[in-house]
Curated annotation (Swiss-Prot):
This is FeMo cofactor biosynthesis protein NifB. The keyword S-adenosyl-L-methionine applies. Its EC number is 4.-.-.-. Changing residue 40 to A: Loss of activity. The lineage of its organism: Archaea, Methanobacteriati, Methanobacteriota, Methanomada group, Methanococci. The gene is nifB.
């Protein structure tokens, strides 16, 4: 409670942590992080000017850190209700050095904006102090299972310390690093949100265990429905009743966030809005489609 009191000014203006202000204050996601170090079976990243889907992992383009200042000035001029600047992809924020370059620019040029990142948590224990030094205080970590035998059905592989881990081995490693990172970040006074993708045929009865496990470390949990696509295109999305039921069970342990828009990596404005600054990317990227890097070992892309 002391931590929440200390950072109450952040929570009062953060639409992704406080659903009471989701239609009052806006956020901007900076798509500076294209590379990812895990392969979720439901995730299909896309970076293209033709991409009009409204879901995580997609963006009109990849923004370079040197363009961030101009980009934010344009946004803040058009949308003065923007209070939060976040980095949420289209890959994993902590697996891209551009994330830290961008956060440094924001901290120097836009100190009044709340800085936020989303991550799979694999590298959180390695970088949480760097984030603290850049005055980041809100972190979202996606945790879809805390049992390896469940997570291996959701994640194909994990790339860590220049080595690829598949199946159960990769799932064990990811869970271990997520728990380590979340605990350390919580001790460092970060405000943490746990995102959990609800996959009825895989983790429906397990999500409450995630809530129980992280109840002393997370401020809020955001349970979001599976978008059937990629390797999970044959699976079904949860019904509204199923989502309500799981949230009610989890709410016994962690407060639930119910205003998530499952936003793009380049989302701008209020959560309910679908604003995209197409003209900016038109000017910065002349190619028809922008090549998406996966990571250094490109033959492991997905």
């Amino acid at each position: 409670m002391e931590k929440m009191s200390k950072f109450s000014h952040l929570l009062k203006a953060h639409p992704c942590f406080n659903e009471k202000v989701h239609d009052k204050y806006g956020r901007v996601h900076l798509p500076v992080a294209p590379r990812c170090n895990i392969a979720c079976k439901f995730c299909k990243r896309s970076v293209s000017k033709e991409c009009c889907e409204h879901r995580p992992g997609v963006s009109l383009g990849v923004l370079k850190p040197e363009d961030v200042e101009d980009y934010l000035k344009k946004i803040l001029k058009e949308m003065p209700n923007i209070k939060v600047v976040g980095i949420a992809g289209p890959g994993d924020s902590l697996f891209n050095k551009e994330t830290f370059e961008t956060l440094k620019i924001i901290d120097e040029k836009f100190p009044n904006l709340i800085k936020c990142i989303s991550t799979n948590g694999l590298l959180l224990s390695k970088y949480y102090k760097d984030l603290a030094n850049l005055n980041v205080r809100t972190i979202t970590v996606t945790v879809n299972a805390i049992k390896p035998e469940i997570l291996e059905k959701i994640v194909d592989w994990v790339y860590y310390d220049k080595k690829l881990y598949r199946g159960l081995e990769g799932a064990k490693l990811l869970i271990e690093k997520q728990i380590e990172g979340i605990k350390k970040a919580s001790e460092e006074d970060f405000i943490i949100k746990i995102n959990t993708v609800l996959i009825p045929e895989i983790n429906m009865d397990h999500v409450v265990e995630i809530a129980k496990f992280f109840k002393d470390y997370a401020y809020v949990q955001n349970i979001i429905p599976l978008i059937p696509q990629y390797k999970m295109k044959e699976l079904r999305a949860p019904t509204c009743e199923e989502i309500k039921k799981v949230r009610k069970e989890c709410e016994k342990y962690i407060p639930q966030f119910r205003a998530c828009g499952q936003c793009r990596a380049d989302a701008v404005g209020l959560i309910k809005e679908k604003e995209l600054l197409k003209e900016f990317f038109k000017e910065k990227n002349k190619e028809k489609n922008i090549k998406l890097e996966v990571f250094d070992l490109k033959h492991f892309s997905h």
